[in-house]
Design a protein with these regions (language model features):
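Acidic, low-complexity terminal tails and accessory targeting/binding regions
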Residues: 1-10, 93-105, 147, 152, ...
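Phosphate-coordination/substrate-recognition cap region in phosphate-metabolizing enzymes
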Residues: 2-7, 46-113
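Short, hydrophobic/glycine-enriched beta-strand segments
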Residues: 11-17, 157
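General small-molecule cofactor/ligand-binding pocket signal
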Residues: 13, 83-85, 201
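Active-site metal-binding loops of divalent metal-dependent hydrolases
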Residues: 18, 160, 206
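Loop-to-helix element that buttresses phosphate recognition and phosphoryl-transfer chemistry
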Residues: 19-74, 124-139
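Short glycine-enriched, charge-decorated loop/helix-capping segments at active-site entrances
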Residues: 27-35, 99-101, 120, 217
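Short glycine/proline- and acidic residue-enriched helix-loop micro-motifs
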Residues: 111-133, 225
């Protein structure tokens, strides 16, 4: 690849998967393979239509069903094949997976408090990932994928936690900093990638959805949990 092309920025459309029943229930999915619900399938079709004319040359997706189903809609709209990458999976939540926020608070109150306060070193029991380990994974994978497409536009379909990591990387924010930005289902998040890293262009675009999108995370400033 010519050296001058290597310096060209990559446009990244980072897209969170559509809604699932467990999103509605505030039940932790993590690495569990939960499909989109009917609304999520509709959201996937809407986000696909929204990005169909963006000139996407590559689609990368988490292998988990909720992300892959969203990617399939985008692939149908653009004619671009999907490349699955396990590095784009959601954070591994160990024993928290399958439980609601309230159930976690009742079963593991001390661990739940460390999680809610974004302790970077806290990892849920049962092979869960700490925020620091998860962040390093997400940024490394996203950097590898974006660096392979200088001067192009790519789509990464992934999860709320991955979107949060990309926002923090692009904004140079501390991992423990409280979250005030949205991570809505089927939202479009726009970044540029250069050899210097990621830059934020636009965030949480849900203009293609009627009535916005669900952000059920428990760590956002002003959230109920």
């Amino acid at each position: 690849m010519p050296a001058d092309l290597m310096d060209e920025p990559t446009r990244v459309l980072a897209i969170r998967h559509g809604e699932t029943a467990w999103n509605v229930d505030t039940r932790i999915q993590g690495h569990l393979d939960i499909p989109l619900n009917d609304k999520g399938l509709w959201q996937a079709s809407r986000v696909a239509a929204a990005v169909a004319e963006e000139g996407i040359t590559a689609i990368y997706s988490s292998d988990l069903m909720r992300a892959y189903q969203t990617a399939e809609a985008i692939s149908r709209a653009t004619g671009v094949p999907i490349v699955s990458d396990t590095g784009l999976r959601e954070r591994g939540f160990g024993e928290f997976e399958g439980f609601t926020y309230q159930e976690i608070a009742e079963r593991w109150p001390e661990e739940a408090e460390r999680w809610r306060k974004r302790d970077p070193e806290f990892a849920p029991r049962g092979a869960g990932e700490s925020i620091r380990v998860f962040y390093d994974r997400c940024v490394a994978v996203a950097t590898r994928l974006a660096a392979a497409h200088p001067g192009e536009t790519i789509a990464m379909i992934s999860h709320g936690g991955v979107m949060d990591c990309l926002y923090r990387a692009a904004s140079r924010l501390d991992l423990a900093a409280p979250r005030s930005w949205l991570l809505g289902n089927a939202s479009i998040n726009r970044l540029l990638h250069t050899p210097g890293g990621f830059t934020l262009i636009g965030w949480s675009d849900t203009s293609h959805l009627e009535g916005g999108a669900l952000d059920e995370s428990n760590d956002r400033v002003g959230s109920a949990a």
